[in-house]
From Swiss-Prot:
Any GO CC annotation of this UniProt entry: cytoplasm
GO MF entries: rRNA (guanine-N2-)-methyltransferase activity
Residues that, per the record, bind S-adenosyl-L-methionine: 101-102, 117-118, 174
HAMAP family noted in UniProt: 16SrRNA_methyltr_J
Coiled-coil segments: none
Swiss-Prot/TrEMBL catalytic activity: guanosine(1516) in 16S rRNA + S-adenosyl-L-methionine = N(2)-methylguanosine(1516) in 16S rRNA + S-adenosyl-L-homocysteine + H(+)
Top EC class for this record: transferase
Enzyme Commission numbers on file: 2.1.1.242
Matching InterPro entries: 16SrRNA_methylTrfase_J, SAM-dependent_MTases_sf
Gene3D superfamilies: Vaccinia Virus protein VP39
Pfam families xrefs: SAM_MT
Protein name in UniProt: Ribosomal RNA small subunit methyltransferase J
Length: 256
């Protein structure tokens, strides 16, 4: 739904052309959601009462920095689900990258991660955030383990993986679901994703594609009480306080 957002200002003219986004000059933008360059980096914003604060991808500060320093290492739920353990650091594709939070955690723990995002505006935020992380001394090594690609994983996962020359042992999925978090901030952020991407009605197709591509396992993040994605039953489940991971295992990940 690239027409739902407009890239604003001369600095984004080339980016808009490359990603197929609408573009308008500064001062002319009338779209509900605007992509614009700010001193803090690329930002996606709309009417604050509806969408909340501007959305950026920043791996160098804030929650990402805190989680990098104090997040709990390989004991974190996403790390356990993806099979990171002593002597085991799999190659991972995050096929529903979003703002890259889970992928950054996995890269922080040493994994090589390909992030795939289908929404052009969100991909642009990821590209910008990763570029700034690459230029920061504290995060450059982590950023070097992350690559970002734009595409619809439900339809072209195999070709995207081949194009980026990665043989993923693990595919991580976090399909859109009705968000029950009581935080108004989270609710407003999710409005942006829903307005741009809609619900993931093709989650069963996405799971099927992931199972075809992953050599060892597929992990699917779900609300704790939500049913699994329609299709094959998961082999294992890991539960957290508000979410869980459904694990579809082809074979075990073993220490190198």
């Amino acid at each position: 739904m690239s027409d739902a957002v407009v890239a604003v200002g001369e600095p984004l003219r080339d980016l808009a052309a490359r990603l197929g986004l609408a573009w308008q000059a500064e001062g002319d933008a009338t779209a509900a959601l605007r992509l614009a360059m700010t001193p803090e980096g690329l930002a996606l914003s709309g009417e604050a009462r509806h969408y909340g604060a501007p959305i950026r991808v920043d791996f160098t500060a804030g929650k990402a920095a805190h989680r990098r320093r104090f997040g709990g290492g390989r004991g974190q739920l996403v790390a356990k689900a993806c099979g990171l353990a002593r002597g085991v650091t799999p190659s991972i594709v995050d096929a529903t990258a979003g703002l890259g939070r889970d992928a950054f955690v996995l890269a922080t723990l040493g994994a090589e991660v390909l992030l795939i995002e289908r929404v052009a505006a969100i991909y642009a935020l990821l590209e910008d955030g990763l570029g700034r992380a690459s230029a920061n001394a504290e995060t450059a090594e982590i950023a070097a383990r992350m690559r970002v690609a734009q595409g619809d994983a439900a339809r072209e996962l195999a070709s995207l993986v081949a194009r980026h020359d990665i043989a993923p042992q693990v595919v991580h999925l976090d399909p859109m679901f009705p968000h029950r978090d009581k935080s108004a901030l989270v609710k407003k952020e999710m409005r942006v994703f829903r307005d741009l991407a809609g619900d993931d009605d093709d989650a069963p197709r996405l799971l099927e594609a992931a199972l075809d591509v992953a050599s060892h396992r597929v992990v699917v993040k779900r609300p704790r009480r939500a049913p699994p994605i329609e299709g094959p039953a998961p082999h294992h489940m890991l539960e957290g306080k508000t979410s869980r991971y459904d694990l579809y295992v082809h074979r075990s990940l073993k220490p190198e």
